UniProtKB/Swiss-Prot annotation:
Pathway membership, UniProt: Lipid metabolism; phospholipid metabolism
Protein name as it appears in the record: Glycerol-3-phosphate acyltransferase
Segments crossing the lipid bilayer: 4-24, 53-73, 81-101, 112-132, 138-158
Subunit composition and interactions: Probably interacts with PlsX.
Pfam families, A to Z: G3P_acyltransf
Species the sequence originates in: Escherichia fergusonii (strain ATCC 35469 / DSM 13698 / CCUG 18766 / IAM 14443 / JCM 21226 / LMG 7866 / NBRC 102419 / NCTC 12128 / CDC 0568-73)
Membrane side Cytoplasmic: residue ranges: 25-52, 102-111, 159-205
Annotated gene: plsY
Keyword Lipid biosynthesis: yes
Enzyme Commission number, as recorded: 2.3.1.15, 2.3.1.n5
Length: 205
């Protein structure tokens, strides 16, 4: 156990450091997401720049790079505390990727993937919370913030032994959304529908 957990933490960080948004944009001939759009190398920004197909590829990859290390460690019998550190390591890799100059995204999809091995019931509730918040508000960032705030309570209800590690993960996501929280408070955050409308007007078919 003592040897497996630190090794899985390193593996999770390296997996997280593979920035799918940057790679997909390069393959599709799109601008670097770190310097275009919102400047965030994540699925939402890629959706704005390259459309649904590219964004879906980024989303799936980002979820998997959080899910696979945690799932593997879970199957190996790693304790909840260490599982939390492994999940955080995957998100830290996404946020500060060693392979891409330590400039990454906000870790939402990767965090979602890291929480998924706890159970499909929890995964469905988390996805529903994010989707409902986005549909009602129009803000992708608010969906992430609300989901991060509620996640520890969901986990406490479904599998309380994972409450502490998920709480640590939620704190990391909220810290990464500090600027978004300020813009939401000042009513300066742009709705996702507005961003897509601007893209269609700029690049008409």
């Amino acid at each position: 156990m003592s040897a497996i957990a630190p090794g899985m933490i390193l593996f999770a960080y390296l997996c997280g450091s593979i920035s799918s948004a940057i790679l997909v944009c390069r393959l599709c001939g799109l601008p670097d997401p770190r310097t275009s759009g919102s400047g965030n190398p994540g699925a939402t920004n890629v959706l704005r720049m390259g459309g649904k197909g590219a964004a879906l590829a980024v989303l799936i990859f980002d979820v998997l790079k959080g899910m696979l290390p945690v799932w593997g460690a879970y199957e190996l019998g790693v304790s909840p505390f260490w599982l939390g550190l492994i999940a955080i390591a995957a998100c830290l890799g996404h946020i500060w990727p060693i392979f891409f100059g330590f400039k990454g995204g906000k870790g939402v999809a990767t965090a979602f993937g890291a929480i998924a091995p706890i159970g499909w019931d929890l995964t469905g509730v988390m996805a529903g919370t994010w989707l409902l918040t986005v549909l009602l508000s129009g803000y992708s960032s608010l969906g992430a913030i609300v989901s991060a705030l509620i996640a520890p309570f969901y986990v406490w209800w479904f599998k309380p032994q994972f409450t502490f590690p998920v709480s640590m993960l939620s704190c990391l996501i909220l810290l990464r959304h500090h600027d978004n929280i300020q813009r939401l408070w000042r009513r300066q955050e742009t709705k996702i529908w507005t961003k897509l409308k601007r893209k269609r007007e700029k690049d008409p078919e």
